[in-house]
């Protein structure tokens, strides 16, 4: 062990001991209720007992599916007699019947593929035949066979797989950690390379089938779906499916266990359609899954993972008659869990790529970066319609228009298909330059990014739960993931669903070791204070993009009473501009969308918190591919064809507020409102009560917003004698080590410490130095604070010069590094004054924190988080 590492570890232990000592009473460490910096009135005594948060408000609306109407409109635009490719769904539960095949033969249908176990067929027919078929009794729906696109060791730590497999209470009957053993996952993708040692055909890979339905355009006559089985390598055109398979269940053989899937013990089944996918191809995968259930029950197929989407199907309502929904419902009815990627069309609302990803029985994964934050390209749900009812098979269900949870999907290291990846030269260059993969392993592994990678990780987590409790269905698994998920700082449910998946807690629920998870999660509780979005204005904008030369942005103004800015563009068919749209705020912060690809109806969007001033809307091309710059000299506007981007800008006003009447007119009103809007703080039943003292119970509650996992002891042992219910849940979470989303170290200290003698002291107050430590720790800066070891405390004057901290002696020595970091980041405010002709700073470290003051501290901590652009 090096000397420097010993110093850091010794310092961390000292921090823990001082926190224990500092929290032994109901007051702050040495604090006597001294006035807040600036000489204001001392805060009042806190209210006790602390109220439980309100129940979540149920706002269930309605949403009319438009799939049939959109199909009719597209048919009307076709020329008479023109052939098209369509997917027709019949009434019924089994495969296409002889009578239904006979119906197709009576129409001018040139050719068809019929599925074997689903009442669905792909047809090539004229416009007139399609229109007639839509109106025929017994036909549930007809849709175009549109193209779909693939939604391209930190990961297992982020979702607590590593912790779960080290938890002695979470083991199977043999005393081994859950790895998905005995569960099979079907990968419905481009294919799987079963010659890869992590995905060995005949071992890990039980069956590998090659689909052929992408040949619909050439088919003549009525033909059954006959995938070719026992193909060792079906991933011959893309490597996407092999990478996905490795994320779900790769066993790490080629890397001696370094790169494994989230369910490394699970088995795999492959269904490959090649790199070019259409709706019918993916339906063939679902049909094959139904076949496996009938012909190979010994495989125990329980999960189908899908990493594709339809960018022409964004912002739409869930459609029960959509053929994909018919297929996934049939699988769900037989106990199969269906997982989808949310899509890569973010960062604006209404960008989930397919109404079928919103099905009540489907789990949709958003994409997290390794920092624990949401990837900008990850598709988001709807602002306008959060939840609504739908009727399916005689049952009323609720649709949530948002991802289910978030799982890692950025720069994910997994299996590389041998000699199959068209981007191998670029991928290899990026893999070498990243340094994340040992050079000798680059022939076998590569990095890819997207919700394509997040979905199989979630599928693997599902396998862990099913091994633990095979009786679970989607009706139990989906709520378990939502109740146990980790809040993500500043994000709303329409963006991240319930937050980051937490499989350690999910396993405890699946095993019925704990049933009390959920209350700290923002989707499972209500709030006393809230700020709604108000009215919006929509403005069309147009930018002519050229690969080189000047591209003029559009300037527009945002007012002080605005709260959110959105931009959205739907790329017309034939537009060569493979571009991203970008919003730039008055401070120069950029908010970009993903790239619009040349497929039918590609839609991209981006959003940003409003800042008063002049904004710019601009367009850019592709800057890099697989991490390699395509324009290293910077002489272009990005790689893209010329084209006009006709987008819309939507600016929302700040709407009505609830529970904040007592902050009106205060100088810190805007700060408190920001903290409330981001769920960094909440009000109380009587109002926000800004001048009341912040309690330890309130601090524990509010720290959960910064990504503290709500993991608790599986044994249900009561940790503190003075907490129950909600207070116990948050106290358990914020005092447990290694539970920070933004610090993956298992040695990460908890933001708060217990009091003493098995007590949490929920009504105790909080000092400024304790709040500074908690916030710096929560945003994942423990390792960075070591840079201040042995230094005197300093602050900055108005010119940026360093000045000494006059009351540094009042800071607990073991907290100094965190306090210094809080000062340097601007989290902890300072008072500058003259002393002996020199400027000095004071921080009042032992002063108690009011609720209003904490809102300011939390807001500044939030603004210190390096959110990805």
Predicted features and spans:
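Primarily auto-inhibitory N-terminal propeptides
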Residues: 37-121, 127-134, 140-143, 148
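N-terminal domain-start motif of subtilase-like serine proteases
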Residues: 56-83, 110-113, 124-131, 150-187, ...
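C-terminal subdomain of the subtilisin-like protease fold in secreted/lumenal serine endopeptidases
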Residues: 62-65, 73-77, 301-305, 437-448, ...
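Substrate-binding/access-modulating region of protease and related hydrolase catalytic domains
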Residues: 95-99, 251-255, 273-361, 371, ...
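Autoinhibitory propeptides
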Residues: 98-175, 181, 200-201, 360, ...
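Subtilisin-like serine protease catalytic core
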Residues: 170-281, 297-302, 333-335, 357-362, ...
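Extracellular S/T/G-rich loop segment that most often corresponds to the catalytic His/Ser-adjacent loop
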Residues: 189, 210-219, 357-459
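N-terminal propeptides
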Residues: 520, 648-869
